[in-house]
Regions:
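Class I SAM-dependent methyltransferase SAM-binding "motif I" and its flanking Rossmann-like core
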Residues: 165-186, 190-194
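Metallocofactor- and cofactor-centric catalytic cores in central/energy metabolism, strongly enriched
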Residues: 47, 52-54, 61, 65, ...
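Short catalytic helix/loop segments, enriched in acidic residues and glycine
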Residues: 71-88
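N-terminal secretory signal peptides
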Residues: 1-17
Length: 249
């Protein structure tokens, strides 16, 4: 007998939710991911057969604004993402546990899910004074990041701090803060810049990987094309005034 896949569909079955409710969720996910309606069957199949991803979320040099944005997602709701669509095993902001028990759990998950988990990172990486300007669990953030990145299947850089260095990297940059990709290499990296990013973009990126097991198509800067491919300016109803050179004085 085949092992049962811990997919989104099996989760719906365990909670005795109808097939109709499952299909509604798949339709919503298709729209959120910016996919055409013709991709619905692909999304449904992925939701039936793909195992829910394990996510480890690290916090570096940041203000937690990206997490504040993430927990305000409404399409889908953050509670649905965390409880139903992914397995968030570590986040020192959202986790119920703290201190040594949480850090021990992180080590356990990294060992059990080696090569299979998604590493979400929020915040830049300070390098001066051996990284002492940001420590978590008695270790520098750089140490924690490098170790966690080794076993990650993919890395998501949430926010401008993780993507580019952020405010901390502004001149004169006293802590020598850099982006995550300046420290980590050799892994698929998805940049989700913004201060903070749009919450639905944050959930959409992790859900794309959850459904298809691969990172979405990226632009030249490493950002997901479905979310960063067009400028709001291009579809603004005031664009005609801009093109005509009509400005308020």
């Amino acid at each position: 007998m085949k092992n049962r896949v811990n997919s989104l569909w099996t989760l719906f079955q365990e909670r005795r939710l109808s097939r109709r409710t499952f299909m509604k969720s798949c339709v919503a996910l298709t729209a959120i991911l910016g996919l055409p309606p013709t991709m619905l069957d692909t999304v449904v199949k992925a939701a039936e057969t793909t195992e829910l991803p394990t996510v480890i979320w690290l916090h570096g040099h940041e203000c937690t604004g990206c997490s504040e944005s993430f927990i305000r997602s409404s399409s889908p709701f953050t509670s649905d993402v965390i409880l139903n669509m992914i397995s968030l095993e570590y986040d020192d902001t959202l986790s119920a546990a703290s201190g040594e028990p949480l850090e021990e759990h992180l080590k356990k998950i990294m060992a059990e899910k080696n090569g299979k988990y998604i590493l979400a990172v929020e915040g830049g990486v300070p390098l001066d004074e051996n990284g002492i300007y940001c420590t978590v669990g008695g270790r520098t953030f750089k140490e924690s990041l490098v170790e966690a990145a080794k076993g990650a299947a993919a890395i998501i850089e949430y926010g401008s701090c993780a993507s580019w260095g952020g405010i901390q990297a502004a001149k004169p940059n006293p802590t020598n803060t850099v982006s995550v990709s300046s420290v980590v290499s050799g892994k698929p990296i998805i940049k989700v810049p913004g201060c903070p990013p749009i919450p639905e973009v944050m959930t959409g990126v992790v859900m794309h990987y959850a459904l298809f097991g691969q990172i979405p198509p990226l632009d030249s800067q490493g950002r997901p094309k479905q979310f960063y491919g067009n400028r709001i300016h291009d579809t603004c109803y005031r664009r005609a005034f801009f093109d005509s050179g009509l400005f308020v004085e």
